[in-house]
Amino acid sequence: TTQQAIVDPDIVANGHVVDRQDGGKQLGPLARLMRTPGDPGNEAAADDGWADLWVSTPRIAPGRSNDGRLPLAGVRVLEIATIIAAPLAASFLADMGAEVIKVEPIGGDPFRGLLGGLGSAKVNAGKRSLSIDLKSETGRQIVLGLIKDADVLIHNFRPGVPERLGIGYTQVEKINPDIVYMQANGYGPDGPGAQRPSTHPIPGAAMGGVLYQMGERVPEALLEIDDLRLWTRRLMHANEVNPDPNTSLVITTSILLGLVARQRKGQGQQILVDMFGANAYANSDDFLSFPGKPDRAMPDAELLGLSATYRLYHCT
């Protein structure tokens, strides 16, 4: 459940939960921007004036710049990542006009061989790709040359691997101090899970999302084979699609924050994002605690809704 996830050791160690003055807990910043960290602040005063202020705040209509350019035109992104979460984030940046160069291992991103390449077509849209052996000196020098001219670097290596490859933040900063360096992985760099490999079902289940989308708990009793197949399919449907794209959106948003901070402060920085924190935010409606907090409203077994006034009804 989300309430169990709030005290998860990796969530706590990576700063995804902060203590409130009333003894409760709430989500921390969306990402860890190492030079311009976010401040969640304290709880707002119980004052209806906040609602009036929000209503009166002018809204800016979305759109292109006056010259027709997309918002990230002129921004160069170097992606050294595989599978879905980080590559999809880079594709979102390409949708906003960024030039994205994807560095793949010899033989290509393994995701190209899954699902007949259908998923890969989306996560690699809008990019130019090249295959490089990062463990070779020649390959490393090519990548360092690309880094020198990049605005953003995205990778999804576990802690320690970039340093061994010569592309850790302190190494990259020496040749490009203005770079926005996005480090995205499973559990985060701190805490007991830092060195564990991660696939999407783990953060999806660990942060409470699966239980919420299941509608009811998996029976604890032994099941007949047909019932077991039914529950297996139900588990997969509740956890297969969300965790990676949830993380992609957080990566994209955090990079945009880094680019804005660079524009305002004149310096690049390292940004840390992990799948646990991203999927905690996907469950933000209940990822908090305070005295007297009600239980999370759960959908019924048929997944028709949360209550009599928030559900699907059959109409004739």
Predicted regions: what they are:
Residues 78, 120-174, 185:
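A structured beta-alpha segment of the ubiquitous adenosine-cofactor-binding alpha/beta core
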Residues 84, 107, 138, 160-162, ...:
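Glycine-rich nucleotide phosphate-binding loop and flanking beta-alpha elements
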Residues 1-107, 173-183, 261-264, 279-316:
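Acyl-CoA thioester-binding alpha/beta core of soluble enzymes
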Residues 165-315:
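Active-site-adjacent "lid/gating" segments in soluble enzymes
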Residues 98, 102-130:
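Glycine-rich phosphate-binding loop and adjoining beta1-alpha1-beta2 segment
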Residues 13-17, 117-122, 197-203, 289-290:
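Short, hinge-like loop/turn segments at secondary-structure boundaries
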Residues 6, 87, 110, 164, ...:
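Generic structural signal for helix capping and beta-alpha/helix-loop junctions
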Residues 23-43, 119-141, 145, 203-212, ...:
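Redox-cofactor-proximal catalytic regions of oxidoreductases
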